[in-house]
Amino acid sequence: MKLRGLYAITDSQLLDDGRLLPYVEAALRGGARLLQYRDKSSDQARRLREAESLRELCERHGAQLIVNDDAELAARLGVGLHLGQTDGSLSAARALLGRQAIIGATCHAQLELAEQAVAEGASYVAFGRFFNSSTKPGAPAASVELLDQARPRLHLPITAIGGISLDTAPGLIARGVDLVAVIHALFAAASAAEVERRARAFSALFEPA
């Protein structure tokens, strides 16, 4: 599948109290193309159950599930993987998951990290944070000038992350971003219906004018 559009990322605090599955399904109905399951807890049994349920939802809606920082879980479920800079070897993950798996890499605000990730077999690279982020407030800041430098040098999808909203996403897409990764601007909502509305609005930004 072409990696372009809304990239929804879960948050265990935002999506507690039974909100995970209905809110994620709402995002998928709204057009999310990728879904990253991000849960840093040590409850492996629960994480497996949740990831299996999310995989079923993604399959139903024609989206791809990506697991954050757990190559073994990704391999067990036959889904994609996202690695941060301290989450282990990308080349080892590629060897484990195979040539067809989607594997993404966090590159912060450094083009050199992105080029290294490409060499190690990444399917996409992620730059950010571009704006103030509730999830990672101390992350290095990235600039739109970085996108101008990256686009001609990287021949794979570019993801932007970090405090992205419906107001700021269009400027990033205009600079060549293929995927906008969103957490709070999508899931910090009072209802699943509101999540779906927001997802449709983000997805519409990628439609031809």
From Swiss-Prot:
It catalyses: 2-[(2R,5Z)-2-carboxy-4-methylthiazol-5(2H)-ylidene]ethyl phosphate + 4-amino-2-methyl-5-(diphosphooxymethyl)pyrimidine + 2 H(+) = thiamine phosphate + CO2 + diphosphate; 2-(2-carboxy-4-methylthiazol-5-yl)ethyl phosphate + 4-amino-2-methyl-5-(diphosphooxymethyl)pyrimidine + 2 H(+) = thiamine phosphate + CO2 + diphosphate; 4-methyl-5-(2-phosphooxyethyl)-thiazole + 4-amino-2-methyl-5-(diphosphooxymethyl)pyrimidine + H(+) = thiamine phosphate + diphosphate. Its EC number is 2.5.1.3. 4-amino-2-methyl-5-(diphosphooxymethyl)pyrimidine binds at Q36, Y37, R38, D39, K40, N68, T106, K136. InterPro entries: Aldolase_TIM, ThiamineP_synth_sf, ThiamineP_synth_TenI, TMP_synthase. CDD domains: TMP_TenI (cd00564). Pfam families: TMP-TENI (PF02581). GO terms for molecular function: magnesium ion binding; thiamine-phosphate diphosphorylase activity. Pathway: Cofactor biosynthesis; thiamine diphosphate biosynthesis; thiamine phosphate from 4-amino-2-methyl-5-diphosphomethylpyrimidine and 4-methyl-5-(2-phosphoethyl)-thiazole: step 1/1. One of its GO terms (biological process) is thiamine biosynthetic process. Disulfide bonds: none annotated. Mg(2+) binds at D69, D87. Its cofactor is Mg(2+). 2-[(2R,5Z)-2-carboxy-4-methylthiazol-5(2H)-ylidene]ethyl phosphate binds at S133, S134, T135, G163. It comes from the Bacteria. Binds 1 Mg(2+) ion per subunit. This is Thiamine-phosphate synthase. It comes from Pseudomonas aeruginosa (strain ATCC 15692 / DSM 22644 / CIP 104116 / JCM 14847 / LMG 12228 / 1C / PRS 101 / PAO1).
